[in-house]
Amino acid sequence: MDYDFKMKTQIERTKVEDLFNYEGCKVGRGTYGHVYKAKWKETSDGKEYALKQIDGTGLSMSACREIALLRELKHQNVITLIRVFLSHNDRKVFLLIDYAEHDLWHIIKFHRAAKATKKQVVVPRGMVKSLLYQILDGIHYLHSNWVLHRDLKPANILVMGDGNERGRVKIADMGFARLFNAPLKPLADLDPVVVTFWYRAPELLLGARHYTKAIDIWAIGCIFAELLTSEPIFHCRQEDIKTSNPYHHDQLDRIFNVMGFPQDKDWEDIKKMPEHHTLTKDFKRSTYSTCSLAKYMERHKIKPDSKAFHLLQKLLLMDPNKRITSEQAMQDQYFQEEPQPTQDVFAGCPIPYPKREFLTDDDQEDKSDNKRQQQQQQQQQQQQQQQQQQQQQQQQQQQQMNAEPNAKRVRLSGAGNQQDFHHQQQQQQQQQQQQQQQQQQMMFNQQQNFQRFN
């Protein structure tokens, strides 16, 4: 390309920083880049936008895919791509999209945190219904246009704040989305592992090669259950590490602990799954004989005879061929009973959820990630030290018992001394239980933060 022409084009090209104020207004980081809250410089209407800066140098395949899809997709419940900015100096790419003040990850987190203060814990029932209906509406539009989202999770379900589209759901992050208008081509050959583990359908975990729209429906079922209970239904401790092997033992174990082990009559094609042999080798049906979705939801005060449970059951059928479609789900009786779903999921009520916080330093989030990793390493080291100390104490106690058996008998012969000994044992057991509970809570919080950014 002629150098003079290149320089002239570069000067004439519209720059994102010339049109928008966004410096110091970073609001988050997604899978593919940073997100900024932006406003037009030349207008005073106060309308807010989101600028998604794609990581890397230039256009990656995932960025090209997201741009190509968003330019074609137009629906009220799918995020709108307004404009694309290319910076040739530093090879940065910016997507100008709708700005949503909230998302389901933060909304559910807000209600889960309320448990500590004994306030209202669950998301209001009417709001759950409105959220679910709009998610289904958006996914029905995608599926009708031969698009699989493939990475549905609470962090990718945005909710608009105050404004013209108040309380409207926007499905975002189309970087994993795929066209499936050529069903003979194995989609698994492109990306063997997609969708965050907690929301991944069982057929994906068993290596299905020709998966369908049903994977998005399963993820919606997981989100629905999480909205009803404020807890991820298939929470798994193991970190989400992208690999070429789709099989994930711990995630399958978690699903079976909630749903029970699938019966052959309920999922006839399970024997055709590539990882079926591994499944039969690793799991026993009898282990999960007392597990069921009804029991799990009943523990969270969702009755098995409720219409909400009946719809959830259809969304979370193990057999993808029997799983309900988005169109069928929208016609379910759950949406016919009061309260009816509303366009504003907040139903005109004040919004209780805090607005997104600014990250004034561009590297602040990366630093927080490093800090979190350092904290995790320190906690692991502390745990190892505690375990070593406990082992040393046990060894010392064992040596004392072996060296002084007679003295031990004398010390324990008195009633008062025996009570002191038992009291010490109880204190040690209580301390160990407290440490275990703290470790479990710490691991859960780490998983929540990890799942949000992946």
Curated annotation (Swiss-Prot):
Compositional bias segments (type: Low complexity): 373-400, 424-454
Catalytic-site annotation from UniProt: D151 (proton acceptor)
Domain of life: Eukaryota
Catalytic activity: L-seryl-[protein] + ATP = O-phospho-L-seryl-[protein] + ADP + H(+); L-threonyl-[protein] + ATP = O-phospho-L-threonyl-[protein] + ADP + H(+); [DNA-directed RNA polymerase] + ATP = phospho-[DNA-directed RNA polymerase] + ADP + H(+)
Region (Disordered): 342-454
Alphabetical list of PROSITE patterns matching this protein: PROTEIN_KINASE_ATP, PROTEIN_KINASE_DOM, PROTEIN_KINASE_ST
One MF term in the entry's GO annotations: ATP binding
Ranges where the Protein kinase domain occurs: 21-335
Keywords: Activator, ATP-binding, Kinase, Nucleotide-binding, Nucleus, Phosphoprotein, Repressor, Serine/threonine-protein kinase, Transcription, Transcription regulation, Transferase
Example of a GO cellular component annotation carried by this entry: nucleus
Compartment(s): Nucleus
Binding site for ATP: V27, G28, R29, G30, T31, Y32, G33, H34, V35, K52
SMART domains in the record: S_TKc (SM00220)
EC identifiers of the protein: 2.7.11.22, 2.7.11.23
Pfam families recorded: Pkinase
Main function: Component of the Mediator complex, a coactivator involved in regulated gene transcription of nearly all RNA polymerase II-dependent genes. Mediator functions as a bridge to convey information from gene-specific regulatory proteins to the basal RNA polymerase II transcription machinery. Mediator is recruited to promoters by direct interactions with regulatory proteins and serves as a scaffold for the assembly of a functional pre-initiation complex with RNA polymerase II and the general transcription factors.
Subunit composition and interactions: Component of the Cdk8 module of the Mediator complex, composed of CycC, Cdk8, kto and skd.
Stated family: Belongs to the protein kinase superfamily. CMGC Ser/Thr protein kinase family. CDC2/CDKX subfamily.
Protein name, UniProt field: Cyclin-dependent kinase 8
UniProt source species: Drosophila melanogaster
Gene responsible for this protein: Cdk8
